[in-house]
């Protein structure tokens, strides 16, 4: 599942960059910029759907990766496991910032 995580992460970064090119964070124009992306940008609706569903797939792959690590006893490797926990917490914080704050 590690390679799927890499593919999901690259897809999220690329689609996020494409969406950020057309998004306006102003309180009055935010909704209209999302509507603009879906209606006027070539394949904007597809890019938006790939980005939203890719986030869910990314977290499913993370949970499968963690589950595989627990099943195989990788938590016994303290340093590796702690780095993974830190990366997981940073991913959760980034997802929270990207979902709640805009």
From Swiss-Prot:
Q: Which GO terms describe its molecular function?
A: metal ion binding; ubiquinol-cytochrome-c reductase activity
- GO CC terms in record: mitochondrial inner membrane
Query: What kind of membrane protein is this, topologically?
Result: Multi-pass membrane protein
Which biological processes are named by the entry's GO terms? mitochondrial electron transport, ubiquinol to cytochrome c
Query: What cofactor(s) does the depicted protein rely on?
Result: heme b
UniProt keywords (A-Z) are:
Electron transport, Heme, Iron, Membrane, Metal-binding, Mitochondrion, Mitochondrion inner membrane, Respiratory chain, Transmembrane, Transmembrane helix, Transport, Ubiquinone
Instruction: Please tell me where heme b b566 binds in this chain.
Output: 65
Record family assignment: Belongs to the cytochrome b family.
Described by its record, this protein's role is as follows: Component of the ubiquinol-cytochrome c reductase complex (complex III or cytochrome b-c1 complex) that is part of the mitochondrial respiratory chain. The b-c1 complex mediates electron transfer from ubiquinol to cytochrome c. Contributes to the generation of a proton gradient across the mitochondrial membrane that is then used for ATP synthesis.
Comment field (misc): Heme 1 (or BL or b562) is low-potential and absorbs at about 562 nm, and heme 2 (or BH or b566) is high-potential and absorbs at about 566 nm.
**Protein name in UniProt:** Cytochrome b
Q: Which organism is it from?
A: Plethodon yonahlossee
What does the record give as the organism's lineage? Eukaryota, Metazoa, Chordata, Craniata, Vertebrata
